[in-house]
Amino acid sequence: RGSWDVQHHTQSGGTAIFTNYDGGAAGENGSSLIQLEANAGIRGITLAQLNIASDGFSVDNPRKTPFLIQGQGPKVYIVNVTIAVGDKGIDLASYDTSGHYVDYLGGVPLRAGIWVGGGAEGGFIRNMQLNPHYGSRLPEGGQGYPAVFMMRFVQSNCSALKFADVKNQTIFNNFVYGSVYGIHFLKDAITGKYPGEMTVIGHGSDGCTYSLFVEDADKNTKIIAINSELVNTKIPNEPVRSYVLMGDKVNTDKVHPDAKLILYNSAFWGSPVFGAIINNGIVSFQQANFSRSGTQGVDVRGGKAHVFTSYFAQKIVEGTNGSEGYARLGIQGKSIEFTNNYYISGFRFNKSGEGLIYGSDKK
């Protein structure tokens, strides 16, 4: 236990562990610096990987290391911990850590934030924030912390939050700034199972390439996101960006056609290339605010979409010849339903193939 009883920033100082540990001969596949057995935990402390960008490594090519913290049994806890800089944050995916509790984590992990799976049940991930400025806003005089500016790197290399085989997981009031994937759902590498039913409340992804990504899902997957704020920013080396990505390619067999992603009360803004890319499964939006919708707001390349009581605020210039719209149903897309929505430039959509566009908005 360290000196902090509240969430804290690198610049606030306090109890810290400075490390040059890089996994030894095993490198990033080595043991974690801190290993938490059942019922063990860490709180009130700051961690800093001093050699992340030294000795032949740099901010463009930082050192690869194991996760700083690994849970190895049930009811582990990580509370009021800050990662000033590190390659990987918290591993709750390699073991069953049922009942894990993560609260008020902050920091800048470069390649991995918090990864959760392993069949864990009843865990909590809440009130955490990942942001590159934890690596550059230091205490008075520096106090030995490495000064690193990692914005561009994390935007192209980090997977901040990963959820795989978990049950009854509480995912509440979390925020990620700068990541390839802000929040990411995928098949479990340990159990081989897919994400089941889970609810995400108050999640924010900003400065991300894909703010929410469902990579793997079976017929029983049902992810509900409530009060999300999903944001893209212009990232020079990321030519495709979207708030939502359902499946990694058109009609991918990694996402079952009956897998469901449901978003309620969502705020979408920034600089997307496409608002939502749907490659398979069923995605539903209810009360979404598309402040910017990109070239195509809801781009159904495979699978289905439903859009209810939502607002499309981006103006579409006359004479775009179908290159822009609030929706596109691709050749292999099955259907899009549009009901009770408002479009600042009127309902504009593009359609290829035999799929169906329907709902009260289609006159």
Question: What kind of region is each of these model predictions?
Answer:
Residues 3, 33, 39-44, 75, ...:
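Detector for repetitive beta-architecture
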Residues 9-10, 22-31, 51-59, 86-93, ...:
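Short glycine/acidic-rich loop motifs that flank beta-strands on beta-rich extracellular proteins
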Residues 20, 35-37, 48-53, 70-72, ...:
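A structural detector for beta-sheet-dominated domains
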Residues 248-257, 262:
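Extracellular and organelle-lumenal recognition/adhesion modules and their flexible linkers in secreted
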Residues 1-44, 48-76, 88-95, 116:
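Extracellular beta-strand-rich solenoid/capping regions of secreted or surface-exposed proteins
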Residues 9-10, 190-195, 220, 253-256:
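Short, solvent-exposed loop/turn segments that connect beta-strands within catalytic domains
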Residues 61-64, 179-203:
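C-terminal/domain-terminus segments
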Residues 292, 297-298, 304-363:
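Leucine-rich solenoid repeat scaffolds
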